Amino acid sequence: MAGCLRHFTSVGDDTKKREWKQEDVEVAYEEPLKNTPHPFIASYSFRGALKWLLSSHKFQIVIICLVILDALFVLVEVLLDLELLAEKVDHIIPEIFHYLSISVLTFFILEIAGKLYAFRLEFFHHKFEVFDAAIVVISFIIDIVYISREDIFNAVGLLILLRLWRVARIVNGVIVSVKTRAEEKMHKLKEQKGSLLEKVAQLEQQCAQQEQEIGRLHKLLQEHNVFPAS
C-alpha cells in the first residue's frame, strides 16, 4: 500500500517537506515559531504565490469538481455518439457539450502550464502529475481535431474514453487535499507548541525569580530577627 501511495504526490510536496523539516531543526535551537506567512509566499514573488495557489486545499476542491463535471460531459458525448439519446435531443446539444468539455480542458491546460512555470523540473518528479498532464493534452488535441472532423470520433472513440480515467484524479485530489490539510494542521500545532514552550519557559523563569525573591526576603527577615531561623 505504501508503495502505491508514494505515487499519489502533488507538486509542492517536496518543498513543503523540506521547509517544515528545517523548521523542526530550528525549533530545537532557536526561539519557538511565530505566526509566519505561508512558506510559498514568504518571498513575495509571483512564482511563490502561484505555488501556494496550486497547492492550496481550495484549489484541489475546484479541480475535483471540474474533473467530475468533465467526466459527465464526456459520458453524455459518448451516449450521444452511440445514438442512445439521438432521438431525444436536438442536434445542437452534442456541440454544446463538446464545447463545454473543451472549456474545462482549456482550464486544465492552463493549470498544467501554471504548474510547469511555478514548479519547473519538480513537476516531472511526480509520475501521477505527468500521467494526468499527458491525458489532458491528448484529450485536448483530440477535441480540437474533432471540431472540424466529426467523423474522427468513430475511429478513435476509445482514445477519448481515456478522459474517464481522469476520475483517478479525484482519488489523487482527495488524497492530496487531506494530506495537505493534515500537514497544515500539524504545522500550526508545531507553532502552537513552540508558543506554549516559550510561555512555559517564561513561567519557569518567573518562578525561579520569585523563589530567589522569597529567599532574599526570608534572609532579610532573619537578619532583623523578625522570626528565628528554622
Curated annotation (Swiss-Prot):
Gene3D superfamilies: 1.20.5.170, Voltage-gated potassium channels. Chain C. Residues 80-96, 149-155 are extracellular. It comes from Xenopus laevis. The segment S4 is probably the voltage-sensor and is characterized by a series of positively charged amino acids at every third position. Unlike other voltage-gated ion channels it lacks the pore domain. Disulfide bonds: none annotated. InterPro entries: Hvcn1 (IPR031846), Ion_trans_dom (IPR005821), Volt_channel_dom_sf (IPR027359). GO terms for biological process: cellular response to pH; cellular response to zinc ion; proton transmembrane transport. GO terms for cellular component: monoatomic ion channel complex; plasma membrane. Homodimer. This is Voltage-gated hydrogen channel 1.
